[in-house]
């Protein structure tokens, strides 16, 4: 199975180079002719009649989104659905693979205005330190193959970030994650990225960061894959809300994810051959797992409960995981309403655990529905 089945690659735009272009709708070629294969079996894509290229293109994931550059904004499913990235800013063209300097990705990410960042070249960017991303940015790797190595992206006290079609590999150093989201960041969408082999996590979401969607990403060659919620002393992480869907966890050892305090919705993910467990619920975690495939290797524990004591509680708890392996229709209830965190709500944050089963209903589009199972587990 190819590691890049989920990435949409387009021919390079033919417009002349410019550091910024106007925020008008910059067209990309229609994805029909260069669309990726359907991918692993858990992605449910209707078949088209032989020779019906136009019909097939319309049914591939994101066909309506990838036809034009800025159509991606606001198209996430789940808690990160409001992320608009650099929708209202100019287009920034990355022309250099250098760590810093004119035309580099780092220069674009530090600019304090909305930007839609695209790449004029393919290649590897060696990061000597975390690349901090400021608010209202889209880092759009469609059309090129961009790999970040050495360090990762840091989303610190920012909002409205879209990260699409990038590779992350070989991050080295203490507390080095592929994508580190902390503190107090929100409205984030990570889509169609490949992450592997970092010294710490691949994606870590902690310290009051919320309203985040991770979709159609590929995770491999790693231990502590995805941590959500810092530790049992950070009770303000009760506001965290994350959706993870259509992701492939391929032989990663643990944390798919591991959750403390917050709420996580998992659907249409494929996790196989983990090394310790698949999903872990720690202190006050609330996890809704729907239509996922868990294919065990030598280790058979899928859902692990790890009790911890919150700093403001007397007894240790492990939270809960609600499992649904067949859901062909409207999904059970998940609260996708407003989230209030930290200073936005007042201090201290002391709200009760919200019920997933008694709130508003989420209807996942038909392209997202499938029947899933747990294979060889206990």
Model-flagged regions — what are they?
Residues 1-18:
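PEST-like, low-complexity acidic/proline-rich intrinsically disordered segments
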Residues 27-62, 258-378:
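Extracellular beta-rich repeat passengers
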Residues 71-117:
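Acidic Gly/Asp/Thr-rich repetitive segments characteristic of extracellular carbohydrate-active
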Residues 98, 122-124, 144-145:
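Acidic glycine-/aspartate-rich tracts in secreted/extracellular proteins
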Residues 106-113, 124-138, 147-164, 170-184:
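Extracellular beta-strand-rich solenoid/capping regions of secreted or surface-exposed proteins
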Residues 136, 141-142, 159-170, 185-200, ...:
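Right-handed parallel beta-helix
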């Amino acid at each position: 199975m190819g590691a890049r089945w989920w990435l949409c690659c387009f021919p390079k735009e033919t417009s002349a180079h410019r550091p910024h272009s106007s925020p008008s709708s910059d067209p990309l070629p229609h994805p029909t002719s260069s669309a990726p294969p359907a991918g692993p079996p858990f992605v449910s894509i209707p078949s088209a009649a032989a020779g019906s290229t136009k019909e097939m293109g319309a049914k591939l994931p994101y066909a309506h989104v990838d036809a034009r550059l800025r159509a991606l904004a606001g198209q996430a499913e789940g808690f990160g659905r409001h992320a608009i990235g650099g929708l209202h800013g100019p287009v920034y063209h990355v022309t250099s693979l250098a760590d810093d300097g004119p035309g580099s990705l780092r220069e674009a990410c530090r600019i304090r205005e909305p930007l839609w960042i695209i790449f004029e070249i393919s290649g590897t960017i060696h990061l000597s330190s975390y690349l901090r991303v400021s608010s209202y940015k889209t880092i759009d790797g469609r059309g090129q193959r961009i790999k970040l190595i050495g360090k990762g992206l840091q989303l610190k006290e920012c909002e409205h970030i879209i990260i699409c079609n990038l590779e992350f590999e070989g991050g080295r150093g203490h507390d080095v994650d592929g994508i580190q989201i902390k503190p107090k960041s929100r409205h984030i969408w990570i889509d169609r990225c490949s992450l592997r082999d970092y010294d710490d996590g691949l994606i870590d979401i902690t310290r009051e960061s919320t309203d985040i969607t991770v979709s159609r990403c590929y995770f491999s060659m790693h231990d502590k894959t995805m941590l959500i919620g810092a530790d049992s002393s950070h009770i303000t992480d009760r506001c965290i809300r994350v959706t993870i869907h259509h992701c492939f966890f391929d032989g990663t050892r643990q944390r798919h994810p591991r959750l403390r305090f917050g709420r996580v919705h998992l659907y249409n993910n494929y996790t196989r051959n983990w090394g310790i467990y698949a999903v872990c619920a720690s202190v006050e975690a609330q996890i809704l797992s729907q239509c996922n495939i868990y294919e065990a290797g030598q280790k058979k524990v899928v859902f692990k409960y790890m009790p911890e004591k919150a700093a403001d509680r007397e007894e240790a708890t492990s939270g809960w995981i609600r499992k649904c392996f067949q859901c062909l229709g409207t999904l059970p209830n998940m609260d996708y309403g407003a989230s209030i965190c930290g200073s936005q709500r007042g201090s201290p944050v002391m709200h009760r655990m919200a019920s997933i089963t008694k709130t508003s209903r989420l209807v996942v589009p038909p392209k997202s529905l499938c029947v899933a199972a747990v294979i060889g587990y206990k």
